[in-house]
Design a protein with these regions (language model features):
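Serine/threonine-enriched low-complexity regions used as flexible
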Residues: 237-239, 302-328, 726-736
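Low-complexity, intrinsically disordered segments enriched in Ser/Thr together with acidic residues
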Residues: 288-311, 713-720
Length: 760
């Protein structure tokens, strides 16, 4: 403190000196201010038994643990986190990142890599509870603890498996079906009207008849190629008609309803023509002639599409009482990349960048806003921390995205309880959530609009002897990554068991929402693309979307399928040109922008600040800095007496700098009165204004694409602020430095916080 005060005396007027001295005291209390001892673990095995029983999801290797509340909450990015999870020694993990949630919860990610040995730890915690996900080599553990005094006491355990019988797996996804349309009934004999006024009427002959035709004596199928079809292109249908009876049928005809709505007939087999039904509906009418017993005939037609044909063309074939519905999705090409910048033309149009200029590109992660509803059953499963448990499951999903190379960040924007039917099963609850079949969900649509929810999750307790942990519709099914149909958002819901022993359940169920199925072995095909599915190797492993039992393994790796990733020495996926292709990573990166655009963002992100590099080089980086007085629901530039203030910084590193050694810097001061800087110990020290004089606020480490810092947490100004402080402005700059080049990327303009007399 003496060093800070001496700096203030040399550079600032008396009023400013007093204010900065107060700020210096505050910085000393920030996370990371106290040095951590490697010999004194923050998380350690405990001989004392917690006051609670091991959780129901616990399986093997259940051990009591304790976690130091104060030291955990003071950790900052770059700090060393000592943990004792086995034996007598400690492992020294490095905190990679911290995050704050709008419900006040926090999350921490820490890692250790030592040769072939590695630890990964993800914690979500609030004042009362902490939940953890631990990976050590092939071992996966979970942490669940509640606060008792100065420590969280609880359990470290391997989760149990789901109840499975006879190797049968209950499917946990559904495929939304097009609405079944009903052709208008004909009330009079057909007149042979042609659509073209210049074409002659049908010649007088024997009228076609379909009397007595049904599924008992005829079989009809349509095979459409290509499927899906890109708007503006054509598709062809081959129609096979088989008389399965031992009787002959004379003068038959088939009609195709809805086919010619918003399409153009380009070609059809002889005997087929476009005409109007008596209800003045355009139909394709095909005379088939006579059918001998067992005879099969094949006809075809080709139609052209436009954007008006979207989202799908329906072809309903009717012969007497026989009806066969077929459809083809009409989509946009979401993969064409004209400028080769790695972002498709379709997605560049969504993002507002120039698809013909490789220098105009937005490679930031897609922020998908999620809403978390939970039932009383879920609350009962985690009575002291249901929302923190939700944060943990979301955090695990975000970590899986990052580790897989998927540029998605789930951001919870709403938590709330719904009084759903406690006796309803998961299929019924999901159905009620989607179609609002239970009054408990009457307000969901309004809340979704108010909070800008892209995806909606319902958390419930896991039923006894359950063999699945969730249920969700598959988005964009067989649409080659196009989610433009208005109904896609209407089905963007999921049911999730909050006490599922498999804590990657959110990643799995939302994977369905984003177009993924399980695997070719289980489902026979992919989801939105043929390669939009999970992957496994028999007796070795599966990725997030596949079921371990289908591949005779207990090893489920926390990554999405990709032929570019390594899984225990095997490829994590299969290239898309193979019939059994599996590349969920490519799928998610192609569709993420559409999912994030389901709803406009309502809960604010950190505001962007213009950035510059000391070198003068152009940089593709973003630094957001903001202060919040309401837990992150909004941001303010004014702080007053008694208000709790959080100061957050979100740094997106230039792609050219990712993977290099670097550090993050925070400079703070009174406008026109000089600057101090925050060091890695959380103390304020003098800054002479030079690049050489910068001191890191985080440990020098490999720069990641995104660095999120809680610069200030729950700071409260005094209820009485001296009059000379009112109207003063505190300026905050954030920067990162690349160690190799020494280049500094910084906010051009600071965040200015006005000290006001009263709260705004």
């Amino acid at each position: 403190m003496q060093r800070v005060e001496s700096v203030a005396k040399r550079h600032l007027n008396p009023a400013c000196r007093q204010l900065l001295a107060a700020w210096a005291l505050l910085w000393l209390l920030l996370p990371g201010a106290l040095a951590q001892s490697a010999s004194d673990p923050i998380i350690q095995l405990s001989a004392a038994q917690p006051g609670s029983l091991p959780p129901a999801m616990a399986g093997q290797s259940v051990q009591a643990i304790s976690i130091d509340v104060t030291r955990l909450r003071r950790l900052a990015a770059g700090d060393v986190l000592p943990v004792q999870l086995a034996g007598a020694g400690s492992e020294l993990l490095t905190v990679q990142s911290l995050a704050a949630f709008i419900n006040g919860g926090k999350a921490l990610n820490a890692r250790l890599r030592r040769g072939n040995d590695s630890y990964s730890l993800l914690l979500s915690f609030d004042l009362d509870t902490v939940y953890g996900h631990v990976i050590h080599g092939d071992e996966k553990l979970q942490i669940q603890a509640t606060r008792e005094g100065d420590y969280y006491h609880g359990w470290l355990f391997q989760p149990r498996g789901l109840a499975l019988s006879n190797n049968a797996f209950s499917n946990d996804y559904l495929i939304p079906q097009p609405q079944r349309l009903q052709p208008p009934a004909n009330t009079a004999p057909r007149l042979p009207l042609r659509l073209s006024p210049d074409a002659p009427l049908d010649p007088v002959g024997v009228a076609a008849s379909t009397a007595g035709i049904s599924s008992s004596n005829f079989r009809l199928s349509q095979t459409i190629t290509p499927s899906p079809v890109v708007a503006g292109e054509s598709f062809t249908a081959e129609v096979r008609l088989e008389n399965t009876s031992s009787s002959a049928h004379q003068s038959l005809a088939v009609e195709f309803y809805f086919l010619l709505e918003n399409t153009t007939l380009e070609q059809a087999s002889p005997g087929c023509r476009a005409q109007l039904s008596l209800s003045l509906q355009e139909v394709l009418y095909c005379e088939l002639g006579d059918f001998a017993p067992g005879e099969t005939k094949v006809i075809s037609y080709t139609v052209g599409t436009t954007s008006d044909s979207q989202p799908r063309v329906i072809s309903t074939a009717i012969m007497g009482e026989l009806r066969v519905d077929e459809s083809v999705n009409v989509v946009e090409d979401v993969r064409l990349d004209s400028d080769g910048d790695g972002v498709s033309d379709f997605n560049e149009d969504l993002l507002g960048t120039d698809a013909s200029d490789s220098g105009s590109v937005d490679t930031r992660a897609s922020v998908i806003d999620v809403m978390a509803f939970y039932t009383p059953g879920a609350q009962a499963s985690f009575p002291r921390g249901v929302e923190t448990r939700i944060n943990q499951l979301i955090g695990v999903a975000n970590q899986i995205y990052a580790d897989s190379g998927v540029a998605i960040k789930l951001r919870p924007v709403y938590y709330g309880m719904v009084d759903a039917d406690p006796d309803a099963d998961m299929d019924t609850l999901l159905d009620d959530l989607i179609y609002k079949g239970d009054s408990a969900f009457d307000d969901v649509d309004r809340l979704r609009d108010s909070y800008g929810g892209d995806l909606v999750m319902l958390f419930d307790s896991l039923p006894d002897n359950a063999d699945r942990c969730g249920m969700a519709p598959v988005g964009g099914y067989q649409s080659n990554g196009y989610f433009g149909a208005e109904t896609e958002k209407d089905f963007a819901y999921s049911y999730i068991a909050i006490d599922c022993p498999v804590d990657l359940v959110v990643a799995h169920e939302l994977g369905h929402n984003m177009g993924l199925t399980h695997s070719h072995l289980e489902d026979g095909s992919g989801g939105t693309f043929n390669f939009a599915t999970g992957h496994g190797v028999d007796s070795e492993f599966v990725t997030v979307m596949a079921y371990p039992g289908a591949f005779n393994t207990d090893t489920r790796l926390p990554v999405f399928s990709s032929p570019l990733l390594d899984c225990l020495g095997f490829s994590c996926g299969v290239a898309e040109n193979r019939r059994d292709a599996a590349d969920a990573v490519q799928t998610l990166n192609l569709v993420r922008h559409q999912i994030a655009a389901y709803a406009p963002s309502r809960v604010p992100e950190l505001p962007d600040a213009s950035v510059s590099a000391v070198s003068g080089n152009r940089v593709d980086a973003r630094i957001g800095v903001a202060a919040s007085t309401d837990g992150g629901l909004s941001y303010s530039n004014s702080i007053g007496p008694g208000q709790l203030v959080d100061l957050l910084a979100d740094v997106e590193v230039d792609a050219a700098h990712v993977g290099r050694q670097g550090s993050v810097h925070v400079m703070v001061g009174i406008v026109d009165s000089g600057f101090l800087q925050l060091d890695a110990a959380g103390s304020l020290v003098e800054w002479d204004g030079t690049r050489e004089g910068l001191i890191p606020a985080t440990s020098v480490a490999v720069l990641r694409r995104q660095e999120r810092l809680t610069v200030l947490s729950d700071f409260q100004l005094p209820d009485q602020i001296p009059e000379e402080f009112i109207g003063q402005q505190v300026a905050v700059y954030v920067a990162y430095q690349v160690a190799e080049s020494g280049d500094v990327v910084y906010t051009q303009q600071p965040l200015l916080l006005n000290i006001v007399a009263g709260s705004d």
